[in-house]
Amino acid sequence: MIRTPTRTKTKSYNGSQSEFRFPDVEVLAHLKLPEHGLNNHHLLNEQLNKKPEDDIHSQHLSDYTTTNSNSGNSSNGYYSFANISDNTTNPDKLSAVKNTACAIGNNRYSYISSSGSSVHYPGTLAPDRTPRICPTNSPEFGRPLDGNFDMQCIPEAYSTVTSDFTLPTADNISFQFTLSSGNSTAMLKKRSTPSTKTRNATNLSEKRKSSVKRSTSTVSRRSNIKRSNAIRCKGGLLHYFTKLGKRVRLNLKKFHLALKRKLFTYKQRHFAKSDKRTTSHLLRSNGYFANIKRSQSMRSMASYSDTSSPTVPSGLDIKNTPIVKHSSNINHRSLRRTPSSIKRAASILTSSNSLIFSRSNSSVGRTDSTRLVRSQPSLNLNLAVRQPSIVVKNKVIPLSQFDHDDYCIREEDEDEEDEDEYIIDTQKMQPLKSEMGSITSSLHDGDSVFEDAMSSSASMESLSESVKILNANKAWDSYLRAVISQRILMRLQVAKFQASQDHHTYKELLDAIVTDYESDAIFSNNDAQTENDSMSECDSPHEFDTLTDSSRSTPAVVPQSLRESFSSLANFQTSVKAGVRRNLTLPVGISI
């Protein structure tokens, strides 16, 4: 007997657990109705009358998809046998149900009649069940159809009636009698009737021998030993030895690989090319060869240079053809062409041809093949200079078809930068004499300060450079004297204000001026001596008053010596060398 409780997702309580019953003492006391006493659907009907059909409120109609684990009424996917036995039910409800009448018969429908109405409604919508009668062919067990003895063969004619409605009874399939094979009748027949045929002992022994041979010849599969759950946890020594075996197997594999590398990789180490890691484009541009090819070429070149002479075509003159020897320690460059590299290539590759033309000017009928440059065998292909040519915009232009002085690309001297667009030439700048004249006339309307300079500009142009330099020096001398005298006068005025009584009113201004003058590096000890001399000359402070008043009232009049220096300053630009060039870092508006 195997108990197989299977859950079904149903709301009518007609599943496989509906007929599961526990025998009770109270039920055993009433032996008049054994089926009704063992069937407790009346308790369920009473419970359904009290509470609505909801998964939260009912334990019996709980859906298996319920996730409300906090509610005590929900089964939450687990089996709940509450209110099925009489142990957990209310005795008041039980007594009330027991007093109700029980309808016994084949009719499963109970009709509920409302007060004062003759209309009868069925108490349930469950279909009418036709009980299946088991055929009794076998006197002992019978002959079931599907190999299992089902409890549905036993008809149940009891239905519980309450005041509201009735839930129909279902078949009890919780307990099933299951045999090992599907065909139960054949097994029962084999058990009931023993075999009458006796087999030969010799045939049995031969079959046993053949089966033993067959089992020894075939490869046996790895059998999985069924262990208990305690051993399957792999705890303790079993887990330790399993890990140890995996670790040892991994270390053995690593040791095997290392041993294979050690034994069978000596060839790669022996024929290693070089330890230098250079990129592929550098190797290509520098004429890279493998070690084997390099050694073969070196040996062949050595034997070739010792034994035989190079083969020359018949039409080529060997005497006049120069032999270009390439040194082995040439710094190899990249193959990218720049304008300077093109110029160098054009000048270097044709140097031998220029010597030929200078030596033999009379030999006019020589072919162009004589102008080829011969070279000794070398390790790198880039050193083997063939016909002199240059590459301009991915086109090879041979230089041998032109004369030495008539190349298709004109060679320019790199030192000559007269036509360079990035150099500003000061000679091309135009003087702004008209604008200067308008500015000076607007500034000095009644005063003719620059008349001498403007009038004498034409006469100064005809002077020599030595006279111009002398005039420039005089102009700078007079300018510096005027500036220094003005600064000395300022120092004297500051000293006068410091000595006066109104010292506090001008204190901040005078301190700022004094700090600026003291921090200035222009005034040296000579300035201090001149200041002392001038202080000794000025006896009374009234002279400073007259000096300051005159300087405030009258405009600044340039002395005659300063006017003469301005005339020399007008031609100061012409005294500087005319070929001075300026960088782009200087502002454009400033002319030197």
UniProtKB/Swiss-Prot annotation:
Source organism, top-level taxon: Eukaryota
Q: Where is the composition biased (Low complexity)?
A: 213-222
Give the residue ranges for region: Disordered. Answer: 186-223, 528-553
Which coarse location class describes where this protein primarily resides?
Answer: other
Q: Which GO terms describe its cellular component?
A: cellular bud neck
Which segments show compositional bias classed as Polar residues?
Answer: 193-204, 528-537
Q: Where in the cell is it found?
A: Bud neck
| Family note | Belongs to the AIM44 family.
Name-wise, this protein is: Altered inheritance of mitochondria protein 44
Q: Which organism is it from?
A: Kluyveromyces lactis (strain ATCC 8585 / CBS 2359 / DSM 70799 / NBRC 1267 / NRRL Y-1140 / WM37) (Yeast)
Lineage per the UniProt record? Eukaryota, Fungi, Dikarya, Ascomycota, Saccharomycotina
Q: Which gene encodes it?
A: AIM44
